[in-house]
Amino acid sequence: IRPHVPWYAPKQWFDLYPPDKLTLPSYLPNDWDDLPEIAKQIAFKGMMPTTDWAIESGEWSKIVQAYLACVSFVDQQVGVVLDALENSAYKDNTIVVLWSDHGYELGEKGSFGKQTIWSESTRVPLVFKSPKIDVQQSIPQAVELLDVYPTLIDLAALPPNPTNEGKSLLPLINQQIDSTAVAITTYGQNNHSMINMQYRYIFYENGAEELYDLQKDPEERYNIANHEALDVLKTDMRKNLPKINVDWKVGSSHIINDYFKRTSKQIKNQKK
């Protein structure tokens, strides 16, 4: 699985990205100053390096180099598969979908890794290749991975499944842009991050909020959730919150910080 730590790839892919030639992500040292406490608790990853450490140690460029090398290695391997498909008897009846289960922070928000609900962790590639899609295009509208299965059903001309929570992306692929659409990511019980064409709104299980104007602040640096003029917008965004949240289970060996050691009962009591 690449790119995934440990970031191993053949040397030729590392050679594409000399550390001293790389442009590193932007970083705001006091980026967390306007965040609610719960956001800091969730984002804290004690096992992972911080951006400050990466700067002081001089390792930041090497970390980025390794990540980019793995991305290029994967890109080449995908090309091998697609070339084989094009030269096979199945090219006219095969659908290919490429996606990732999460993004990755490379120091932009103070640390490295995933496990947050900001854009670096929640944004992933999603690529469809199908005989029914004859136009190469890039679509800016945010969608959800829940939409992959309904889209495959649509592309395969199968009857829709009414139990699916997602929706087919075929209309979107055919240029029917929905400017009101919202995509949601949930991390931990009742912590939701949603995005539309202009804003990212985050609503935590204790009622804390973050709001970013992506047109003015695409790097999500300045939390404007406390601006009274945006209360109506936040109320409208909250209408998209899931009505059901599955209780989480404790005891996992993969718990990475104290926040996730709490039980569902403790969460519900905290909200009262």
Regions found by a protein language model. Name each.
Residues 77-84, 88, 151, 155, ...:
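Short alpha-helical functional segments enriched in proximate histidine and acidic residues
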Residues 56-70, 113, 133-143, 155-160, ...:
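Active-site rim elements
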Residues 8-9, 16, 83-134, 144:
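Histidine-centered active-site microenvironments of extracellular/periplasmic hydrolases
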Residues 1, 67, 71-74, 78, ...:
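Beta-strand elements within well-structured catalytic alpha/beta cores of enzymes
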